[in-house]
Amino acid sequence: MVKKAFISVISQEENRGSVEFQVVSFTNKIRRLTSHLEFHRKDFLSQRGLRKILGKRQRLLSYLSKKDKVRYTELISQLDIRELTTR
C-alpha cells in the first residue's frame, strides 16, 4: 500500500480546488480502499465509501472531459485509469 503515490503531481499543483487535484486525491483514496478491501472483504461500510468516491471521481472526470479534453487525456494517462464510457 502506497500512501503518497502521486507526490510529484500534488506538489506541483498549488490550487487544491482544481479538478485535477481532486481527481488525484480521490484516486489515492480509491487505491487505498481497494487494498484495504482485499484483506477485509466483509467491510461493507468501506465498500459503500468506495462506491461514493468512485461516483465523485466519475462526475469530476466527465466535467473535465466536457470542459477541456486535452487536460482530461493528460490526467487519464498520468493516473493510468480507464477513459469514461458514454452511454
UniProtKB/Swiss-Prot annotation:
Keyword Ribosomal protein: yes
Superkingdom of the source species: Eukaryota
Subcellular location per the Swiss-Prot or TrEMBL entry: Plastid, Chloroplast
TM spans (from-to): none
Assigned keywords, A-Z: Chloroplast, Plastid, Ribonucleoprotein, Ribosomal protein
Oxidoreductase recorded as keyword: no
CDD domains from the UniProt entry: Ribosomal_S15p_S13e (cd00353)
Matches recorded under InterPro entries: Ribosomal_uS15, Ribosomal_uS15_bac-type, uS15_NS1_RNA-bd_sf
Example of a GO biological process term: translation
Pfam families (alphabetical): Ribosomal_S15
One Gene Ontology term of the molecular function aspect: structural constituent of ribosome
GO CC entries: chloroplast; ribonucleoprotein complex; ribosome
Quaternary structure, from the entry: Part of the 30S ribosomal subunit.
PANTHER family: RIBOSOMAL PROTEIN S15, BACTERIAL AND ORGANELLAR (PTHR23321), SMALL RIBOSOMAL SUBUNIT PROTEIN US15M (PTHR23321:SF26)
Family as reported in the entry's similarity comment: Belongs to the universal ribosomal protein uS15 family.
NCBIfam families in alphabetical order: S15_bact
Protein name: Small ribosomal subunit protein uS15c
Species whose genome carries this gene: Oenothera biennis
